[in-house]
């Protein structure tokens, strides 16, 4: 049976995660187009929902759970010239609302698995 070919452009978190997830399907041949040189370190952090965290654990082999910081509480603020205003709060006793991680660490794992 001939495999369907898929091309993914971009080596950001979404492109890498998509490439890895699709590469696990035997009927697909996945190609990733990315930059040849990395000129900067990605020191950003990303937050994902509990469902996305579960998906990461499904797709990435032996994912180190210590790379993720679970959060059961979220407070959102906006800043004016003279004050900080809290405009939204989420608080959950039993389950995590989101998981925060450093982009570089997860991207390095994804590059190794692809």
What residue spans do the PLM features occupy?
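N-terminal FAD cofactor-binding segment of flavoenzymes
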Residues: 41-79
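N-terminal Rossmann-fold NAD(P) dinucleotide-binding loop
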Residues: 15-16
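Phosphate-coordination loops involved in phosphoryl transfer and adenosine-cofactor binding
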Residues: 3
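Conserved N-terminal helical subregion
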Residues: 69-114
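Glycine-rich FAD pyrophosphate-binding loop
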Residues: 7-11, 20-44
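Short, glycine/charged-enriched secondary-structure capping and boundary segments
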Residues: 22, 45-48, 90-91
